[in-house]
Amino acid sequence: MGSSLSLAVPPGPLSFEALLAQVGALGGGQQLQLGLCCLPVLFVALGLASDPIFTLAPPLHCHYGAFPPNASGWEQPPNASGVSVASAALAASAASRLATSTDPSCSGFAPPDFNHCLKDWDYNGLPVLTTNAIGQWDLVCDLGWQVILEQILFILGFASGYLFLGYPADRFGRRGIVLLTLGLVGPCGVGGAAAGSSTGVMALRFLLGFLLAGVDLGVYLMRLELCDPTQRLRVALAGELVGVGGHFLFLGLALVSKDWRFLQRMITAPCILFLFYGWPGLFLESARWLIVKRQIEEAQSVLRILAERNRPHGQMLGEEAQEALQDLENTCPLPATSSFSFASLLNYRNIWKNLLILGFTNFIAHAIRHCYQPVGGGGSPSDFYLCSLLASGTAALACVFLGVTVDRFGRRGILLLSMTLTGIASLALLGLWDYLNEAAITTFSVLGLFSSQAAGILSTLLAAEVIPTTVRGRGLGLIMALGALGGLSGPAQRLHMGHGAFLQHVVLAACALLCILSIMLLPETKRKLLPEVLRDGELCRRPSLLQQPPPNRCDHVPLLATPNPAL
């Protein structure tokens, strides 16, 4: 009977990653596509870096003149009685000094019994630009709330874009969302630079954040879905490093331009050139998404273009690649997707558990950064440069740290370490602030900023790896929207003029400790295939600590057992 009766087990369906290798799509063509997906991240970073500078409050100085009875240039409130000679002299002395306070209520430098500057404000002293939106419309003192409102609306624009553009990315494709939002970023940015009122600027900045979020989400999905398991981390970190480079580039552009309107046009108008991405065969749709959506002909075309880019000009594809493309539906079979109702999605409890944990972790990682480094934390130019370079530098170091450790120790372990370091830094600053010298406080602040940056990057990557392709746009959009909402901690703190900062830090530190416990419930995705459908995503779970692993399937009974002579 021997080998002639041995049963050949039919090979299972190929995964998408194996299909890429079989077709020959991994190589130069894939790297070109990944590079095209990373380039828009530069302009997303430029847009993010612009808001702190455009809304940076300059040191205030009221122009004063010699007109009685107010020799200081400040106006008395209506309910004030007369001004004595001593009061007028005191007011003139106070106003003659250059005020360095940036308190939006102006209470830090207004003379006694005076609250309005009769003449123009002097906004000299900005670290980078000669003037910004604050100086354009005198958004100080009683109008200072408009600056905080603009910051909140810009962040809400990003959160709304991540949240609401995920569904179109799943329904109509990643490429269409990227092209549409990139094409609208240029006109929106130029329109914001030409706005004639602060209200128009706020509305267009909200829309700009909405569009930039769509770009960021779309290209993140396209980069991730084109990689095999060994490439995903490197590609994700490459996109983050491009974003860090965008922050450094923005400082250079701001030093050159000096005018905030010209700078706004400079960082948004070039996005119109991305319309060339619509050229057929240049910027390709995600082949993984096309297969899941059962658009087989389009998927064959995309894979063929990627494979042909890796071959010398004129050389035909191999026979194995041709057969795999022609029989794509049977080579890589995936269930056809359908429209999912919210009620049906509630049945997949493990997917929701992963979303809840990673969304909460991403929110805390972004919210707690303000406790280590306020945006534009100092009033002097040197303080602003230090804060900006510190934020960008720690983000770059976080990328290097993740690139060295994550593939060796796993996503979940390094995420747990990052949140642990974040909690340690917060507890040290909260409990030992009065006992630490300046060097120790700076060290713990840098540690907290570095670890929170690493936790935010890794939680986004881990979320993209556990969410199925069928709902990856919506799921990842939710995670990134929660991260954007975490950035509201800074404007919220400035809205209350610093009151309650200690309590806010205590709450966020406690939430960081809660994240440490919840991260242990996440699955490990290192070198694993991406889930394609909801059933695959439901299987992404951490093995139970109490349940023993199933024994290896081993047949201990020989096929041709010899009888025992003793019987």
From Swiss-Prot:
Region (Disordered), start-end ranges: 545-567
Keywords carried by this UniProt record: Cell membrane, Glycoprotein, Ion transport, Iron, Iron transport, Membrane, Receptor, Transmembrane, Transmembrane helix, Transport, Vacuole
Source species of the chain: Bos taurus (Bovine)
Protein name, per record: Solute carrier family 22 member 17
Entry-linked PANTHER family: SOLUTE CARRIER FAMILY 22 MEMBER (PTHR24064)
Subcellular location: Cell membrane; Vacuole membrane
Family to which the UniProt record says this protein belongs: Belongs to the major facilitator (TC 2.A.1) superfamily. Organic cation transporter (TC 2.A.1.19) family.
InterPro entries listed in its UniProt record: MFS_dom, MFS_sugar_transport-like, MFS_trans_sf, Sugar_transporter_CS
Gene Ontology molecular-function annotations: transmembrane signaling receptor activity; transmembrane transporter activity
Membrane-spanning ranges: 147-167, 176-196, 201-221, 235-255, 266-286, 350-369, 384-404, 413-433, 444-464, 475-495, 502-522
UniProt GO BP: siderophore transport
Domain of life: Eukaryota
Glycosites: 70, 79
Gene Ontology CC entries for this record: organelle membrane; plasma membrane; vacuolar membrane
Gene name as annotated: SLC22A17
PROSITE patterns cross-referenced by the UniProt entry: MFS, SUGAR_TRANSPORT_1
Function recorded in the entry: Cell surface receptor for LCN2 (24p3) that plays a key role in iron homeostasis and transport. Able to bind iron-bound LCN2 (holo-24p3), followed by internalization of holo-24p3 and release of iron, thereby increasing intracellular iron concentration and leading to inhibition of apoptosis. Also binds iron-free LCN2 (apo-24p3), followed by internalization of apo-24p3 and its association with an intracellular siderophore, leading to iron chelation and iron transfer to the extracellular medium, thereby reducing intracellular iron concentration and resulting in apoptosis.
Its membrane topology: Multi-pass membrane protein
